[in-house]
Curated annotation (Swiss-Prot):
Name of the encoding gene: aroC
Cross-referenced Pfam families: Chorismate_synt (PF01264)
Taxonomic classification: Bacteria, Bacillati, Bacillota, Clostridia, Eubacteriales
Function as written in the Swiss-Prot or TrEMBL entry: This reaction introduces a second double bond into the aromatic ring system.
Top enzyme class: lyase
UniProt xrefs under PANTHER family: CHORISMATE SYNTHASE
Cofactor annotation remark: Reduced FMN (FMNH(2)).
Species, as recorded: Desulforamulus reducens (strain ATCC BAA-1160 / DSM 100696 / MI-1)
Identification of the protein by name: Chorismate synthase
Binding site for NADP(+): 40, 46
Cofactor section: FMNH2
Family according to the record: Belongs to the chorismate synthase family.
Record-level GO BP terms: amino acid biosynthetic process; aromatic amino acid family biosynthetic process; chorismate biosynthetic process
This protein's pathway: Metabolic intermediate biosynthesis; chorismate biosynthesis; chorismate from D-erythrose 4-phosphate and phosphoenolpyruvate: step 7/7
Annotated CDD domains: Chorismate_synthase
């Protein structure tokens, strides 16, 4: 069973994750993980925190000589900003709990419901954990899963489809090589240069007015074998699990797979993908409006997922709120934040998709070592070609 937990606060000493169930013999390097962490910190519209942090992973267990051992993997990412908060966020009784107290919840954040649920008079106890800073740990964990996918010839790419009112035009038949090249050269991870220019202007305008912007990103996965997931129970449907993982990313408010919500607006004849057969190829679809999943099971076509991110709740022109201490109306508190973090969310989206696919692969093929799962996947693919 492949699973993980993360721990840590935004201004605590570090973020930590423990991964259990990863196969032995998987090559994993600091450089690979750090590259993905750097991507998460990039993107136009980020805030001042990114000038402080330079995320780097440290492996504390489970990896030796650049390869996983099969033991639980402990990884840690230090928070460089900790030195500015060590007295306030200290775990001991000497913590300066009366400093930087937050009592004015931000609309759209976990602040108020979290403070009520956990009976906190200082909202900092909520916002420190609910912060998207936690996603750095999930990117590190998901990057390990991505290493496994790449060893199995499964490749994925994410890109930004829209920011605010600006939508990119991205052809469905673009190769993964073209998509990767275009997104890598874009400061917004957007493969449409003209749309990117307009997005930058809209972000600048939002910054000038103290506002924030959301958007949509897409993740495509190529080389996914037939048969991951299952139709037999709701919680084994792969589309359900992928959507849940995407919705678990901070600020994500909607997820669609394939044609998604667009399928509700057209007749079935324009939704469902017709099935064909060729001796050298086997069964295949003439289109991919299902996004690579039918009945909760992968069908061999590329996976296509999109997620909608709401604008960040922290506004430099804050909205009206109420102080939880004196119940008087105030403007919401302001924490250091981004204007737009859709590109960063895209990187997190890649990571959580990679993780869920790794879990599904382990469930389907099992194995304790990389060689074992490779052999079982190869055997399965040979059988599928004969069906």
């Amino acid at each position: 069973m492949l699973r993980f937990l993360t721990a840590g606060e935004s201004h605590g000493p570090a973020l930590t994750a423990i991964v259990e169930g990863m196969v032995a013999g998987l090559p994993v390097t600091h450089e690979y993980i750090n590259t993905q962490l750097a991507r998460r910190q990039g993107g136009y519209g980020r805030g001042g925190r990114m000038k402080i942090e330079k995320d780097e992973v440290q492996f504390l267990s489970g990896i030796r000589g650049g390869y996983t051992t099969g033991s639980p993997i402990t990884l840690q990412i230090a928070n460089r900003d900790w030195q500015n908060w060590c007295h306030i966020m200290a775990s001991g009784p000497d913590a300066l709990l009366d400093e930087r107290v937050v009592t004015r919840p931000r609309p759209g954040h976990a602040d108020l419901p979290g403070a009520i649920k956990y009976d906190h008079s200082d909202i900092r106890n909520i916002l420190e954990r609910s912060s998207a800073r936690e996603t750095a740990a999930r990117v590190a964990v998901g990057s390990m899963a991505r290493c496994l996918l790449e060893e199995l010839d499964i490749k994925l790419v994410g890109f930004v489809c829209s920011i605010g009112s600006i939508k990119a035009s991205v052809a469905e038949n673009l190769s993964i090589e073209d998509l990767v090249a275009r997104t890598q050269s874009s400061q917004l991870f957007c493969p449409d240069e003209q749309a990117e220019e307009a997005m930058v202007k809209e972000i600048d305008q939002a910054k000038e007015t103290g506002d924030s912007l959301g958007g949509v990103f897409e993740v495509r996965v190529y080389g996914v074998p037939v048969g991951l997931g299952s139709h037999v129970q709701w919680d084994r449907k792969l589309d359900s699990r992928l959507a849940g993982a995407m919705m678990g990313i901070q600020a994500i408010k909607g997820v669609e797979i394939g044609l998604g919500f667009g399928a509700a607006a057209v007749p079935g004849s324009q939704v469902h993908d017709e099935i064909y057969y060729a001796a050298q190829r086997g069964f295949y679809r003439g289109s991919n409006r299902a996004g690579g999943i039918e009945g909760g099971i992968t069908n061999g076509e590329p996976l296509i997922l999109r997620a909608a991110m709401k604008p960040i709740p922290t506004l430099y022109k804050p909205l009206r709120s109420v102080d939880i201490k004196n119940k008087e109306p105030y403007l919401a508190s302001v924490e250091r934040s981004d204007v737009c973090a859709v590109p960063a969310a895209c990187v997190v989206g890649e990571a959580v998709v990679a993780w869920e696919l790794a879990v599904a692969l382990m469930e389907k093929f099992g194995g304790d070592s990389l060689g074992e799962i490779k052999a079982r996947l190869n055997q399965w693919q040979q059988w599928v070609r004969q069906v």
